[in-house]
């Protein structure tokens, strides 16, 4: 893999984003959805 294309930095920056940031965002949105959808008894 050579850095001859325009967005050569993209795979390097997408690895921590997809491994760390994406699960945190998904878990946060899922937590907000579950807590807002919970019946208030």
Swiss-Prot record:
<dbReference type="InterPro" id="IPR036357">
    <property type="entry name" value="PSI_PsaI_sf"/>
</dbReference>
<protein>
    <recommendedName>
        <fullName>Photosystem I reaction center subunit VIII</fullName>
    </recommendedName>
</protein>
<comment type="function">
    <text>May help in the organization of the PsaL subunit.</text>
</comment>
<dbReference type="GO" id="GO:0009522">
    <property type="term" value="C:photosystem I"/>
</dbReference>
<dbReference type="GO" id="GO:0015979">
    <property type="term" value="P:photosynthesis"/>
</dbReference>
<keyword id="KW-0793">Thylakoid</keyword>
<feature type="transmembrane region" description="Helical">
    <location>
        <begin position="12"/>
        <end position="32"/>
    </location>
</feature>
<dbReference type="GO" id="GO:0031676">
    <property type="term" value="C:plasma membrane-derived thylakoid membrane"/>
</dbReference>
<dbReference type="Pfam" id="PF00796">
    <property type="entry name" value="PSI_8"/>
</dbReference>
<keyword id="KW-0812">Transmembrane</keyword>
<keyword id="KW-0602">Photosynthesis</keyword>
<dbReference type="InterPro" id="IPR001302">
    <property type="entry name" value="PSI_PsaI"/>
</dbReference>
<keyword id="KW-0472">Membrane</keyword>
<keyword id="KW-0603">Photosystem I</keyword>
<keyword id="KW-1133">Transmembrane helix</keyword>
<comment type="similarity">
    <text>Belongs to the PsaI family.</text>
</comment>
């Amino acid at each position: 893999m050579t850095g001859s294309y325009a967005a050569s930095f993209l795979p390097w920056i997408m690895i921590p984003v997809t491994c760390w940031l994406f699960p945190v965002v998904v878990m946060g949105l899922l937590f907000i959805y579950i807590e807002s959808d919970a019946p208030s008894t």
